[in-house]
């Protein structure tokens, strides 16, 4: 497991909250603490939608992805909550790669059902003027091959480089 420390926090926050860099990721959970606390859960509530809306959304996005809000759908709420002169005491955003992203990253490396592939998540944490990202692969069942985690770590670092987000790896031993 690696820990990525972001060097230019202001640039990263612009990518996270203002640009479309992370818009296609699924939101698992987001939390921030300022004068009060805001918690956003990314699980989409099926009962909010009529059956036609739900069916259409799931056919467009796929069953897994339609169960979660995208970061694009939720980031404006977070932005309006934290904007101002003071930085939040805490900002935590847990994002998951969409099924399409996961397929691109893992390719045909695993001979298992799609439902048995690991979820690829990044846990973004800003606290005490430090911003870190911890990439994680969460497996729904036991697989002897755990290389998806390493593939995700490498893909995430390359993604950050392409977006010109400056970082270094922390020694997490």
Regions found by a protein language model. Name each.
Residues 131-173:
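Mixed-charge, glycine-accented linear interaction segment located at domain edges/termini
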């Amino acid at each position: 497991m690696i820990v990525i420390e972001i060097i230019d926090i202001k640039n990263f926050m612009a990518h996270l909250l203002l640009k479309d860099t992370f818009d296609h990721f699924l939101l698992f959970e987001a939390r921030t603490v300022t004068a009060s606390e805001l918690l956003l859960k990314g699980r989409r509530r099926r009962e909010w939608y009529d059956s036609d809306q739900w069916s259409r959304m799931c056919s467009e996005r796929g069953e897994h992805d339609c169960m979660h809000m995208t970061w694009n759908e939720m980031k404006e709420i977070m932005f309006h909550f934290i904007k101002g002169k003071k930085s939040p005491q805490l900002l935590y955003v847990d994002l998951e790669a969409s099924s399409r992203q996961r397929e691109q990253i893992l390719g045909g490396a695993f001979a298992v059902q799609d439902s048995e592939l690991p979820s690829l998540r990044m846990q973004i944490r800003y606290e005490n003027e430090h911003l870190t990202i911890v990439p994680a692969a969460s497996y729904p069942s036991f697989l002897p091959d755990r290389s998806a985690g390493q593939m995700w770590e490498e893909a995430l670092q390359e993604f950050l480089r392409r977006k010109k987000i400056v970082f270094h790896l922390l020694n997490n031993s």
